[in-house]
């Protein structure tokens, strides 16, 4: 994902076996600060099939993302409605070394979280959640080692490439269908937002060397806003990936291959590609829904959903609660819309009601 790519491209010291970094920087592959990604490299000997060789470089990465109930900021739950600067939304983790060659840097993390302009309210909870994410990564790494041991490195890598190639071809078939329906005429949609901004998108199909591709151009979208409805670039790209994946009628794993036939144009400094340190917390949960609606509207396949994530949050220094409330989904050419469901960005389950009773 975007966070792994950002870490790989960073100037940080190279990964070592046993390392895990954590990151939530919206301007470096992230979404908003409560979403913290743990990234663990997987080192496998190049000739591991024969049982010899040295582990000198990571061949795979495993990652897990968790939405933390609180990461600091001016309100409990780290979803302030009136933030205007990123620091008001919580503590920044920009490829922080959580585990250094097997050693958990718990005190260093605690100090880092405490020195934010608006510190986290319950660091023990954050640390416990991060340990759970690390455990998930470790399980993923174990399964990768098991696969390589059973099938061999070359076979595993070949199938990983096949999964991406298959996803690319599946999306190209979707583009072919769009081309047959609309030709090369731009598919355009504009979605106004309650904050006064608007999202403009134009989707154009092109043919080069008998291969079809699509350009998704957000030129004309409003400039970044003084509020927190700005959406980081990764959020916009994720919405494009999501929409085109839903148009594929075969069960394929979601992966980067889906993006290969797609060219995404997002002007610098606009609502969907803001400049640091603009606030972004609502961009991930509100603007992302509007981006999705604009894409479905341009393609003519789905009416708009409720267009919001309906965030509900409260708390104090001891407890923090965060919930999303469901709404309606749009109709399509051959089916009706629905009510009281989670749509698009959320697709989440309800929190146990016992949490409210605490």
Task: For each feature predicted by the language model, list its residue ranges.
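Glycine/proline-enriched, intrinsically flexible loops and inter-domain linkers
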Residues: 1-47, 53, 57-358
